[in-house]
Amino acid sequence: FDYGFGPFRWVCTSGRAEDLDTTDRLAAEVLEEMLRTAPDDIRGQLEDNLHWIREAGRNRLVVGSQARILYADCEGRTRIAQAFNRAIADGRISAPVVLGRDHHDVSGTDSPYRETVSIHNGGGVGWGEVVNGGFGMVIDGSEESGRRIREMLFWDVNNGIARRSWARNDGAVEAIRREMARTPGLQVTLPNSADDNVIRNALNETES
């Protein structure tokens, strides 16, 4: 999550396996392109995710809806979604696609009631205590869908990375630096990391 990778989901509303196959191919093409210039700290993630999406179809992971899940970062999600939107517009995908994500994601809603020792009811948070949240966004090949992809996915991922960077997680700090370089309009205040010895000495002085 520190690097922005999380469970990106999509559903082909046509219900056609052929449309899901097309989305798999488009997602793989995006990941292949990203790997050409990817920094070392996320290269392994991209390689694993590329292997996953290439193998997903032959492993028959679909149960019911023609849907897929793929771990992807902000750039990956946005580029994949835009590729889907273009494919819908030109007819390679026959119907709209619904984008979403897991409730437990980079920018997912905190769940103060999550059961961390055992899960008895399958929900993970206890009966009646669910305060998680996700989203579903329909893309239909339109320019308006393209705008929503750019704005919604950008905010959804980078909001979480910023929060994690403020916790001084090295991966998140590097990820948000990279995003600010890629998106000049984004300005996130970076944390100041104090030397452990300075903090230790200050605490010792307070106690004495």
Q: What is the meaning of each model-derived region?
A:
Residues 1-208:
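Ligand/cofactor-recognition surfaces for anionic moieties
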